[in-house]
Amino acid sequence: MRTTCPLSSVAVACVAVLLVPACTPAPPPTAAPAAADHPDLSGVWMAFAVENPDGTGNAPRYSPEGEATLDEFAAQFSEVPETGAWCYGTGMPSVMMSTVSYPIEIVQHASRLVMVAELEMQVRRVYLDGRAHPDDFLPQGVGHSVGTWDGDALVIDTALLSEWQLRPWPRTEQTRITERVYLTKLANISARPTGFVATVEKPINDDVLVDEITVTDPTLYAGPQRRTAYFQRMADTATLEYACSAEHWLEALEKNRASQ
């Protein structure tokens, strides 16, 4: 490990490494703590409901051009395989709207917030250090996210998303996603508007994380598409390895064994 000796004293001080504090190894770096003046969103969370605040159902509204694009893509194939069966992560915004009992772990620090979704092990990094979206970023399913605090709510802007031509949430490189994430209590969301789709009758505790999601794309959607996802805290739960692709590999291995 590198020592911290001044050059002028290397010959003497570094010989006495156990006696001179200046020569002791530098302490290992530690992660920056979450800023004390903002709510800590850290923890394991499970989505239990998604709603459309417009009350018009959860299916997105596409533009005529968007409908044509999706139909044209699907018409090329006799059948479009189910993405989950092939361990193919659907990316944003679907990863924040999944209510299929796979948790999301949030780790918050002062400079960034990391979300790890157990489903297909999709990872989001939300940068909180004031940086802008880069010019040389390779588009990907979860995009590139930057966040700013608005009081107790974290506002996330996601861009640089890769193209996705499957319903219900297609994307182009022009797709933009804005989120407003904050903590509340279950009692504060008891008045549920039309379009609320719950997967459990009642969350297991009163701690609720709310993610207000707005998806825009000038070619795909008929205006901004808004959804609100509700997550319950899973205090005694840990995210696990999502070893989906291992099954396909083992199946291929067995086929090779049988062909010998």
Stretches with model-predicted labels:
Residues 3, 14-15, 37:
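Terminal low-complexity, poorly structured segments
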Residues 9-22:
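Bacterial N-terminal signal peptides
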